[in-house]
Amino acid sequence: MGLFLFVLLGGLLFFLLEYMTQAEDWVSFSGSPHLYNSSNIGCGTITDRIGNVLLDISQGRTYSENGNTRKSTLHWLGDRKGYISASTVSTYAASMVGYDRINGVYNASDEGGNARLTLSEKVQNAALEAMGNRKGTVGVYNYKTGEILCALTTPTYDPENVPDIAND
């Protein structure tokens, strides 16, 4: 009986330690049908450094109204089909769904969380215009704080107007 209790308590302790250190990863696991639909997380918004909404995924996937902003942030926010992965969404998934260790993902207000990036919509769009039709990358950061102000990769496309490349 003593060995059984020892193993039981050891297993419980192991589970609690794993829960305390890994719960955020468990919650934001992309296979969770409670949070994801069609490989997209089901709630929250992503804004730039001053609060401009870049992506709202509380009801589907709504991008910025500005076409240049949609193009310049595509590689950060991904597309609807998952052809370009959404690294920002993956990184901030737990906070966007409103997860905390006490309540889990339960949210009485039924609103998602907000992820505020250090990116600047203005700088992203200026970099996109400066790149024109050239291929490459633009990166701008604040060396004092480490904040990324701009990270642009071209070529890019507007996720609201996906090009047909079947005949290319």
Where are these regions (language model features)?
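Periplasmic/cell-envelope proteins involved in peptidoglycan metabolism and beta-lactam response
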Residues: M1-D168
